[in-house]
Amino acid sequence: ILQSSFCQGLAARSLEESEPLLKGQSIVLADDHIQFVDTFNNLTSRMNDDSYSKLDIDEIIRELLQIRLEFAQLAISAVNLELKLQGGRAYATSSASSRRFREAAFLPIQAPTEVQLKWILSQLK
């Protein structure tokens, strides 16, 4: 849950920073932003769902691991959207966007890695 929360926070910040940049030519990316916000809201709702008490332990583990995987994928997508909208200034090493980019780049290899999560989920089906 803690790792999901980190990914959730990273995605939230990138989506927040991206929204005011959706103007002019960049408006062509508005649908991506809307989709990511919808995914964010859905994942947040699933993570905060109080119906877990009705599930068996394997179902709870499967759902939490799936949420962790999906939040990591969303964070990477949200940060990439922010970078596209920021343009070259996003890559300045002192920028918050650059820091989020480095954090998102680490997510697929953060233990449990994306490969490990997918493997575990495949075994739990």
Model-derived segments and spans:
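Functionally constrained cores in energy, signaling, and assembly domains
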Residues: 3, 8, 33, 50, ...
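Predominant activation on well-ordered alpha-helical scaffold segments within soluble catalytic domains
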Residues: 8-16, 72, 76-79, 118
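Generic structural signal for well-ordered, non-transmembrane alpha-helical segments
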Residues: 9, 34-41, 65, 69-76, ...
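Generic structural signal for short, solvent-exposed loop/turn connectors between secondary structure elements
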Residues: 20-33, 48-61, 116-118, 122-125
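C-terminal helix-coil-helix/basic helical segment that borders enzyme active sites and/or dimer interfaces
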Residues: 23, 41-73, 80-92
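Glycine-rich phosphate/cofactor-binding loops in nucleotide/flavin-utilizing enzymes
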Residues: 89-125
